[in-house]
Amino acid sequence: MLSEKIKLMSQSRGWWYDDITQEYSDALLSLGIDLSSDFAQFYLHVEDGATFHSRNHEIYQICWFVINSSYQLDLKRTHEILKIPNEYIPLDGFQNEGGYFYNKKTGEVLYINVGDALTKFLQGELKPQWVDFNSFIEWFFDFDF
């Protein structure tokens, strides 16, 4: 379930949409995302264009990218090149050789960059920094109210 903090923040910024489109639901289902997850609820209801900007970084509006870009191809390439397990989906364009990844099985979010962090992650030595998507989004938008 999406946290009340995220919902209130989204509403206050004019990003919250009560209606869910079938197209966005289908986009998430094509990625194997549970529509009742906090991840799905965020992307089904919150939108500020194709990306969200905060902390000098941007993350995708995943549904928009699945529908309007080559996200599925990029996803395949990411898994093949970086050797990241298939349950991890990128939340951004891997800017500056680093990026955020959502684990669709556990709900955890991970930030890794090319080099030692990627190697440690692949060896099981680096664990996701956020235990769930809510805590990641609350951190990403840097709010506490």
Regions found by a protein language model. Give the residues of each.
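Intrinsically disordered, low-complexity regulatory segments enriched in Ser/Thr/Pro
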Residues: 105-119
